[in-house]
């Protein structure tokens, strides 16, 4: 039996995709490969494979041990992706960038969830031959469609009328997630209901924290910011929604889109190059907020078109 030591603190910070990715992978290994792999978590005993999901300093130090076996690192971000996420003092940011790359360079193999990251890593001096693209995934044991009756019951319990057009979005409240555009769309469509699940996972160091906090506090009446929500509850919101909208300006391979797909919910995203190889064929794409507005209106007025995209998401 192959011994794998998983190293992760992904679930210490609630409401971020890294934790969802880790949870799904652990569920898959334990459910489908229990007789092939012995999985240890944050143990420093000898292993055949050490799989690093987060870049904690103590994990970095462990890479110098001969007990680690083959070292595999999960690339959830590169320095450039932090620009629109975190606001740090210049020295702290310089240190974090260099530490991140040093961690990745300690690995024997790296896993990326989007093939667009391979040339970015190469630009940072990492050999692309040791980088493998493995897409994220979501178990349909966790996320799945519900019956029409249960959907209506969920909508009633959460204050939605049967004929409400509900637009759902999810993710950390950050500029890069397009939260500002989500708010603007809610303002432009007072006859529709909008819900955003997610909060400030990194608190005050979130880029644009004060401005975004004020925007959330003054959201229009038809927009509800739920705050950080457990994944077990998220399935209800996907199933209540008529449309899942993720207006992000920058992503890797968003778990929220896969969760929406798993519940047969139509998905709209911003038209980004990084999506083209992974999810674009199955989504409604929009170039900007005006395009999103037009497409939302078209979908709300044409249930057959909405059903077409629901079928694509499956």
PLM region descriptions:
Residues 228, 236-241:
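Short alpha-helical donor nucleotide-sugar binding micro-motif in glycosyltransferases
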Residues 208-232:
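Nucleotide-activated donor-binding/catalytic signature segment of Leloir-type glycosyltransferases, i.e.
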Residues 269, 280-291, 297-304:
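Conserved acidic donor-binding segment of nucleotide-sugar-dependent glycosyltransferases
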Residues 262, 266-269:
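Short hydrophobic beta-strand element within catalytic cores of glycosyltransferases
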Residues 91-110, 213:
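Membrane-proximal helix-turn-helix segments that form the acceptor-binding/catalytic region
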